[in-house]
C-alpha cells in the first residue's frame, strides 16, 4: 500500500493537472454522490490535501471530496477525451478543458461539507500528518510521551495512523534502523538523546522520501537520493556496522533490521 510520500506525490499530480481550472464535466459512480455532479460544473479544485493515506479534494463552492484508496484505488491523469484501456472500475471523473482526473476501484468515497471535516470518523481518528510542514519534532516528542502512546511498542505504534498519519511499513523499517532501535522498544524507555533522534527521524525520513525518491544524483551511492538502507535487503550487509540484515514479522507485517546495531 502506498505510504504518505507516495500519496502526497499523487496529490501533487492531481493539482498540477486541474487545480484552478473550471470543471466542464463531473461524474460519480455511486448514487449518493450523483446529486453533486451538477453542483460542481463550473467550479474548480482549490487544492488537494492529504491526511495520511486519504485525499481531500477541495472545491471552490466549499464542498470536499473525501477518498481513501485503501488497497486497490488509483488516480490517473489523462488528456480530456482520452479513455484509458483498463479493467478497473471507474468511480470518479473530474474533467476540465484540457485535463481529466479519474479515480478507479476505490470504494471509500464521500462528499463532505465544511462542518463535516471535523466530524468525519477517519479524519477525527487520524493523527497529524508527517508531511505537514507545521508539524515539529517537539510536537512529535509530546505525542511519543503522551499517556496514549508512551507504552506502545514501536512495531505497532509506527503503523497506527492515530499516532502519526502517513507512516507505513517501509518508513517504519527505515526510521527504526536510522535511530538504532528495534520494534520492541517503547517511548517510555528511551533516554533523552534517543527520544530526540526518533522525533526528528519520524519527520525527516518521510519528508526526504517525498522530496527525492525517484530522483537521481550521480554523486550519491547507486545514484538514488532516497534509497532503502534495510527494507527488502535481508541477507545483505548493513552499511553502518557490517552485520547481516535480517527479516522477521512484526505486527503482521514484514520487518527488516540489523541485529548488530539495532538494540
Curated annotation (Swiss-Prot):
It comes from the Bacteria. Gene3D superfamilies: 1.10.8.50, MutM-like, N-terminal. Its cofactor is Zn(2+). This is Endonuclease 8. GO terms for molecular function: class I DNA-(apurinic or apyrimidinic site) endonuclease activity; damaged DNA binding; oxidized pyrimidine nucleobase lesion DNA N-glycosylase activity; zinc ion binding. It comes from Escherichia coli O139:H28 (strain E24377A / ETEC). InterPro entries: DNA_glyclase/AP_lyase_DNA-bd, DNA_glyclase_Znf_dom_DNA_BS, EcNei-like_N, Endonuclease-VIII, FPG_cat, MutM-like_N-ter, Ribosomal_uS13-like_H2TH, Znf_DNA_glyclase/AP_lyase. Binds 1 zinc ion per subunit. SUPFAM superfamilies: Glucocorticoid receptor-like (DNA-binding domain), N-terminal domain of MutM-like DNA repair proteins, S13-like H2TH domain. The keyword Kinase does not apply. GO terms for biological process: base-excision repair. Belongs to the FPG family. NCBIfam families: PRK10445.1 (NF007763). DNA binds at residues 70, 125, 169. Its EC number is 3.2.2.-, 4.2.99.18. It catalyses: 2'-deoxyribonucleotide-(2'-deoxyribose 5'-phosphate)-2'-deoxyribonucleotide-DNA = a 3'-end 2'-deoxyribonucleotide-(2,3-dehydro-2,3-deoxyribose 5'-phosphate)-DNA + a 5'-end 5'-phospho-2'-deoxyribonucleoside-DNA + H(+). The keyword DNA damage applies. The active site is at residues 2-3, 53, 253. Pfam families: Fapy_DNA_glyco, H2TH, zf-FPG_IleRS. Keywords: DNA damage, DNA repair, DNA-binding, Glycosidase, Hydrolase, Lyase, Metal-binding, Multifunctional enzyme, Zinc, Zinc-finger. A zinc finger (FPG-type) spans 229-263. Involved in base excision repair of DNA damaged by oxidation or by mutagenic agents. Acts as a DNA glycosylase that recognizes and removes damaged bases. Has a preference for oxidized pyrimidines, such as thymine glycol, 5,6-dihydrouracil and 5,6-dihydrothymine. Has AP (apurinic/apyrimidinic) lyase activity and introduces nicks in the DNA strand. Cleaves the DNA backbone by beta-delta elimination to generate a single-strand break at the site of the removed base with both 3'- and 5'-phosphates.
Amino acid at each position: 500500500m502506498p505510504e504518505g510520500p507516495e500519496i502526497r506525490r499523487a496529490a501533487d499530480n492531481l493539482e498540477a493537472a486541474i487545480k484552478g481550472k473550471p470543471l466542464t464535466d463531473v461524474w460519480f459512480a455511486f448514487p449518493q454522490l450523483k446529486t453533486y455532479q451538477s453542483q460542481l460544473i463550473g467550479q474548480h479544485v482549490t487544492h488537494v490535501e492529504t491526511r495520511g493515506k486519504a485525499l481531500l479534494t477541495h472545491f471552490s463552492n466549499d464542498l470536499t471530496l473525501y477518498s481513501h484508496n485503501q488497497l486497490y484505488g488509483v488516480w490517473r491523469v489523462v488528456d480530456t477525451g482520452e479513455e484509458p484501456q483498463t479493467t478497473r472500475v471507474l468511480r470518479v471523473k473530474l474533467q476540465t478543458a484540457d485535463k481529466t482526473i479519474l479515480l478507479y476501484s476505490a470504494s471509500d468515497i464521500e462528499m463532505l461539507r465544511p462542518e463535516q471535516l471535523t466530524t468525519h470518523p477517519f479524519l477525527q481518528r487520524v493523527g497529524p500528518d508527517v508531511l505537514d510542514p507545521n508539524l515539529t519534532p517537539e510536537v512529535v516528542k509530546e505525542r511519543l510521551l503522551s499517556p496514549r502512546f508512551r507504552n506502545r511498542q514501536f512495531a505497532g505504534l509506527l503503523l497506527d495512523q492515530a499516532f502519526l498519519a502517513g507512516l507505513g511499513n517501509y518508513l517504519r523499517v527505515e526510521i527504526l534502523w536510522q535511530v538504532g532501535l528495534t520494534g520492541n522498544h517503547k517511548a517510555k524507555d528511551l533516554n533523552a538523546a534517543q527520544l530526540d533522534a526518533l522525533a526528528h527521524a519520524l519527520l525527516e525520513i518521510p519528508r526526504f522520501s517525498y522530496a527525492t525518491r525517484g530522483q537521481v544524483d550521480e554523486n550519491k551511492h547507486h545514484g538514488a537520493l532516497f534509497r532503502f538502507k534495510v527494507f527488502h535487503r535481508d541477507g545483505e550487509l548493513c552499511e553502518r556496522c557490517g552485520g547481516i540484515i535480517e527479516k522477521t514479522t512484526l505486527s503482521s507485517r514484514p520487518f527488516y533490521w540489523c541485529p548488530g546495531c539495532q538494540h
